[in-house]
From Swiss-Prot:
The chain crosses the membrane at residues 8-28, 41-61, 73-93, 94-114, 133-153, 157-177, 208-228, 235-255, 265-284, 289-311, 325-345, 349-369. GO terms for molecular function: transmembrane transporter activity. This is Uncharacterized MFS-type transporter YPO1380/y2792.1/YP_1213. GO terms for cellular component: plasma membrane. It is a multi-pass membrane protein. Belongs to the major facilitator superfamily. YcaD (TC 2.A.1.26) family. Keywords: Cell inner membrane, Cell membrane, Membrane, Transmembrane, Transmembrane helix, Transport. It comes from Yersinia pestis. It is found in: Cell inner membrane. Its main location: membrane.
Amino acid sequence: MSAYSRPVLLLLCGLLLFTISIAVLNTLVPLWLSHQQLPTWQVGMVSSSYFTGNLVGTLIAGRFIQQLGFNRSYHCSCILFALATCGLMLTVDFWSWLGWRFLAGIACALIWVIVESALLRSGTLTNRGQLLAAYMMVYYLGTVIGQLLLGIVSTQLLSVIPWVGALVITAMLPLLFAQFSHQSRHESPPIAVWPMLKRRSARLGINGCIISGVLLGSLYGLLPLYLSHKGMSDASVGGWMALLVSSGIIGQWPMGRMADRYGRLLVLRIQVFVVILGSVAILGNYAMAPALFILGCAGFTLYPVAMAWACEKASADELVAMNQALLMSYTLGSLAGPTMTSLLMQRYSDNLLFIMIAGVAFVYLMMLLRKPDHQQTPYAAV
């Protein structure tokens, strides 16, 4: 029996539309603020408020789904995101956009947890990997489409918000024709996240998720600003962002295969080294396209490999808590990355974006080069 049932396909269609809207706004919001002459640190704070919303959404998602179920919670989250998007049209100022992007971040995190949980509940032990792989591919595909749209349509605020809002409302429609059952509140014991964060065998994996959050949060939030300050148009910025995310899509399968065959520790070391190499290449004004490509290949695949490392020693009943801990770690990194990096960029130079990325990657590489107390050659379970 195929893993891709009718409800699953409809859910993924809704996710695709929702992700396109996220990608468009994540690129244009920093550019719109920059066009209004807001300082770089304020642009970074608005990006961080979005990731703060992600953290809050992650924490409340379980109870939200428990109370409303998958379908109703999905629809409510879409409505919240649409309202937060339309609110951007009211006024362009730091404090109001800080609030709107915070609400948008909550809605996005809710959608991610809802979709992931619905897919896991729909699948079996033999096809959950296929479902989550499809989820990741749809997410990145939607991100690329969103970036490419910036080269086709007008990027003016009052032109973009109406059709993005309509796209989010359209993303609600597929789940009107699909029903997902949800877990009752008495079906499983409460999840304890804190012991997972303190687990010694998972430390390098958790650190990897934090580093991945710093890296991707900074790239998503501040790379458009970096490129804009280089004199690029909004359409060109969208094209470069599409290249970055496309390289992440291309890198998913080979990195996963390498981790299975050669061990996750070796692959993590290679990934982090390539992140440093790509950052140095951009700082050295070498060819932008190949440098950004290898940076995306390594950076966008770091999180799943680190997550797999951390989950290796977790028992079946600990996986949910461990995954929640890893998502929280990633979100905290995504929150800290744009905040610290934007302040450094404002005070010194835009080049601090890639100096920061290379610096945190180097620190993690030093951790990985030490003898791990996890296991000598960590392989995925077959």
